[in-house]
Every structure is written in C-alpha cells, then in structure tokens.
Regions:
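Short beta-strand-centered segment that lines the nucleotide-binding/catalytic pocket of NTP-utilizing
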Residues: 54-68, 106
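Short gly/ser/thr-rich secondary-structure transition/capping motifs
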Residues: 12-17, 81-84, 103-108, 138-141, ...
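A generic structural signal for short, well-ordered alpha-helical segments in conserved domains
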Residues: 43-47, 90, 201
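Residue-level signal for inorganic ion chemistry
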Residues: 33, 60, 86, 104, ...
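Conserved nucleotide-sensing/catalytic segment adjacent to the nucleotide-binding pocket
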Residues: 72-106
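Short, basic phosphate-binding NTP loop
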Residues: 1-32, 41-55, 179-186, 193-195
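Acidic, Mg2+-coordinating active-site environments of NTP-dependent enzymes
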Residues: 27-28, 95-99, 120-200
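Conserved helix/coil segment N-terminal to the catalytic DExD/H
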Residues: 108-116
Length: 201
C-alpha cells in the first residue's frame, strides 16, 4: 500500500515536472543506459564518444551530471534524481543547444516513474545480475523492470547472453546485439566487464 502511494506520488511529480519544464526530452535525442553493473561507466563512455565527435551532449549519472559543459555533484549516488531535478537538467541542456542527452537509468528510477515522459531514442542494457531483489522481490520482476527502458526506446542495445531472456518483450523492436567473444579488442580499462561496457557504448 505504502509502496503504491509512493509510486503514485512520483508519477504525479513526473507529470507536473514535465509540464512545468515543457517536456524538454522531446527536444533531445535521449540515450538511456540501464543494468546492474557498468551503468555509470557506459554512460560516461557514450558521452565522451559523442563529445569527441563534436556533438552537443550532456549526461546525468547517479554520481554526477554534466549539463551544458558544467559539472554538478548530484549527490544521488544510488538512483536517478527526482523527476523535478531530472526535467530541470534536461531543460538546461536543451536551452543550451545540446542535441543529445545520455542518462543513467536505474531500476528504481523506472519503477518509481522518475523517467516518465522522456522519449528514449536508444535504450542500452549492460547486464543483469541478482541484485536489488529486496525492492523487486524476484529476479524476473527485476529483469522485467530493466527491460522497460529497452521496450520504450526506438532502438534496443543488449548483450547476446541477455537477449534470449528478453527476446519476447523486445519482439518487433530494432535490436542491436553486442558480444565480447565475437569482437576481441584491448582497452586500458581494467576487467573483462569493462570490455562489455565498451561494446555497449
């Protein structure tokens, strides 16, 4: 009951924030990144790739945000900012003239409607492991929540090992697969998991 009320509160906040700031996500090409691990790294990699290509881009992670070239310590460190702050950042980026936004998206952010109203052009899934079950109850529920981002996006980017479990929910969707086994390469980032992050980016 309490959880349902919290969800309703966050949804109402998201609706009001979108209206107040004029649905700023519609003015941006938004790339959402979700997963259990590697969200912040992959979000940052995509941001740096687009920035290096001369594209006007901002990003928001659970650690910090870079909006219109200025860095902000969000202080969230766990989940997405509340909808009000999220929409405010999107509006600042759009008003600055940025064309792209890279957004780290947590399962709590999805289930609590914090990213409601944002039209995702691309949804990226890094990986899904057995975490956050205290909130989601079961792995199936957790995985399904993560897939919400990909099902809402125009293009879904997902690893081959997760695609089989997600195939039904992504039916009819444009899907881009990545597989570190088929694309061997070297990176200065340590750990095999960072190879997955690079491929996802």
């Amino acid at each position: 009951m309490i959880r349902s009320l919290k969800g309703l509160y966050h949804l109402l906040e998201a609706i009001v924030a979108n209206i107040w700031f004029g649905f700023p996500g519609k003015s941006l090409t938004v790339i959402g990144v979700t997963g259990t691990d590697g969200k912040t790294t992959t979000t940052t990699l995509i941001y740096e790739i687009l920035k290096s290509a001369g594209i006007g881009v901002s990003m928001i992670t659970s650690i910090h945000a870079v909006i219109a070239g200025k860095s902000y310590d969000t202080g969230f460190h766990v989940t997405n900012p509340r909808s009000w702050w999220l929409q405010k950042y999107l509006r600042q980026a759009a008003d600055h003239g940025d064309t792209h936004m890279v957004l780290e998206v947590t399962s709590h952010g999805l289930s609590q409607y914090r990213v409601w109203g944002i039209p995702f052009a691309v949804g990226v899934l890094t990986n899904v492991t057995h975490e956050h079950l205290d909130w989601h109850g079961t792995f199936e529920s957790y995985f399904s929540t993560k897939l919400t981002l990909l099902s809402q996006a125009n293009i879904a980017v997902i690893g081959t090992e997760d695609f089989e479990k997600a195939k039904q929910k992504l039916e009819g969707k444009e899907v881009k697969l990545y597989d570190s086994a088929n694309y061997p390469f070297h990176t200065k980032l340590l750990g095999d998991f960072n190879k997955r992050n690079c491929l996802a980016a």
